[in-house]
Amino acid sequence: MILDSIHSPEDIRALDQNQLPQLCKELRQFLLENVSKTGGHFSSNLGVVELTVAIHRVFDTAHDRLVFDVGHQAYVHKALTGRQALFSTLRQLDGLSGFPKPYESVHDAFIAGHASNSVSVALGMARARTLQHQDYQVMALIGDRALTGGLAYEGLNNVGASGEHMIVLLNDNGMSIDPNVGALPNHLSKLRSKPAYYHFKKWYRGLFGESPSQSAIYRFNHRLKTSLKKTLWPGSTLFEDMGFTYLGPIDGHDLPRLCDMLTWAKELTGPVVVHVHTQKGKGYAFAERDPGKFHGIAPFDPETGLLKKAPGETFSSVFGKTLSDCAGEDSRICAITAAMEEGTGLTVFEQAHPERFFDVGIAEGHGVSMAAGMAKQGMIPVFAVYSTFLQRSYDMLVHDVALQKLHVVLGVDRAGLVGADGETHHGCLDVSYLTSIPGFTVLCPASFAELRTMLHQALFEIDGPVAIRYPRGGEGVFNADTSTQAAVRMRDGCQAVLITYGTLVEQALSAAEELERSGISTRVVKLNRIAPLDTAAILRETEGAETVLILEDCFENGSVGQQLAAAMEEAGQICSHTILQNLKDHFAPEGTVDQLRHRFGLDADGVVKTVKEAMSCEQ
């Protein structure tokens, strides 16, 4: 196999041109064999096989800088840069990351995970290159879906104005950019990809002297050309008006043409856009038919395309179903998502109430501001968004929502430790930033039943902004409590008090049982609401305890534990040990939630160990 001989991009450049199609075929088979076992981002990688091979054929990513946007499509890049043998550990604890990571390889120029930032990052690198008098190529690889994010246009605007030479590789798989249809645009695309076209363009301008725009003939021809371009080739004028040289659109699976186009882009000066059409899921029939299903997928049977383990009910699906039911009773309720309809469980809402469902694209800040406008006019907007992406809209939460005390409801999905996507996708900051905003109510269900109750509260009983934070996946095994009290005692005890919220309640209850067997009487207090904190109720629960442990899967700064420790000190409540059991200041890596909880001492075993150590020190 050719792929077995590829240990670095130098090996790709050493291949004969006629070997490259076979390499692409082997790469797709490699992806199928590995991702079907580990799960991961599949269809997006199938779509960029030829493009990635062409990049490594033309550029030297050990020297040049390739900045991925989001990074979903980096698997092929990793396989070609010396990491094939690690794919059995993909997205696993201490294994190969599913996203670009500079600590893994010199070929990974920048960490990726969130969308729309690649152009800005690449411009920063290009400007550094100029200031440092260095010589290397800079590329930003961005998908058309990421162009729904405003940050991408901020970057493009600045790149065009800068005049810096860098290349924006636009991977257009048809999700948000209209395709160009017909033979003439295709012919023009081929013409514009040739160096002779640009030599002629320069020569033609020279015919009219130093100020060609002063010539009536030149101005007429320029207007005619622009009019034809806008009719036949609408994408090009956007980038050219911004100051880019636009190349394309071209077939992203035509490897020889890709190599020619990238070589020409490399030789140009100033900012360049190379517009490439690809097919998401190419080469695997099931992914071609349903690329969305195979975008991020759990382990599956490669023969049938079916998941090896049938998905069960999740917090996301319960949220979407409950919200849809409530919307059937109240026409003011609207649902908003930021390109995550299926992931946030809102498909059922969109099907039942399409006129009140809004997908704003990768534009979380816009989603929050739009929700604020809807709330101001009497609607009840509900924005379902992953915790890690909500942090992109912090200013809007403060300025547009909280300052006016608007009734905006946030469904903060994937809160806490998420799992295999690693540092960029855990939801470990929302506790700190949401509880810091005056006027916000933050609710934390530990079960599906509690989620239903709290969503009803948020919609109909609580004034002002409300956030409901819930984890990825299913509920734990314990007796659910649907009390609307801010703090609920789940288990009696007097020596140690465990305080927690969300799905960590299950870990606290298990730990309390083990501690009881060891002779330590342990109380468990579940917080249904972490903002505003009912400190009086919580302090009543902690009074007289020898050890108080606050268990959270978030960072310590701004945590509930930090707030409670301060409240205990202010109230003069003294116990032998007040322990904040959380992530401290560590970004959690890839791994299953159970593995990560164990690593950071957030599972029942970790809690038992900490409490026993504290109590033994006291004795």
Which ranges hold each PLM region?
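A glycine-rich helix N-cap at a beta->alpha junction
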Residues: 86-96, 161-175, 196, 402-414
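N-terminal amphipathic, basic-rich helices that act as targeting or association modules
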Residues: 1-80, 238-244, 251-258, 275-276
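Non-catalytic terminal/interface segments that mediate subunit docking, oligomerization
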Residues: 65, 278-390, 396-406, 499-502
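Peripheral docking tails and interdomain loops at the edges
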Residues: 300, 307-311, 419-421, 440-441, ...
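Structural signature of the thiamine diphosphate
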Residues: 217-286, 407-413, 432-479, 547, ...
